[in-house]
């Protein structure tokens, strides 16, 4: 994957994650821009480039799948903006907590 592809993926993920929140979206875009510009002078064969590209992809994936924004609705409640890319867990590990034996661990063998 190239740096340009990672940049575009990160930009798109920020657009999805921060849609409707102009100040945060602007700050995210500026941060993306600044970080990529700062590294733009590195030679193409620099060994540090690939790990940075992978990190950008991880951040894009996190923004797209795991970040949910909420707006206060009063009475200590929030309205969450969950979109089509938001990862939804089934909470199986929570439902079965405390039922049965441990699968290992330090002292519960």
Swiss-Prot record:
Lyase as UniProt keyword: no
Region annotated Disordered, chain positions: 68-109
GO cellular component, one term: mitochondrial matrix
Signal peptide: none
Chief site of localization: mitochondrion
One GO term (biological process): mitochondrial respiratory chain complex III assembly
Compartment annotation: Mitochondrion matrix
GO molecular function, one term: protein folding chaperone
Keywords: Chaperone, Mitochondrion, Transit peptide
Biased composition (Basic and acidic residues): 83-93
InterPro entries: Complex1_LYR_LYRM7 (IPR045298), MZM1/LYRM7 (IPR050435)
Family per similarity comment: Belongs to the complex I LYR family. MZM1 subfamily.
Function: Assembly factor required for Rieske Fe-S protein RIP1 incorporation into the cytochrome b-c1 (CIII) complex. Functions as a chaperone, binding to this subunit within the mitochondrial matrix and stabilizing it prior to its translocation and insertion into the late CIII dimeric intermediate within the mitochondrial inner membrane. Modulates the mitochondrial matrix zinc pool.
Subunit structure: Interacts with RIP1.
Protein name stated in the entry: Mitochondrial zinc maintenance protein 1, mitochondrial
Organism: Verticillium alfalfae (strain VaMs.102 / ATCC MYA-4576 / FGSC 10136) (Verticillium wilt of alfalfa)
Primary gene name: MZM1
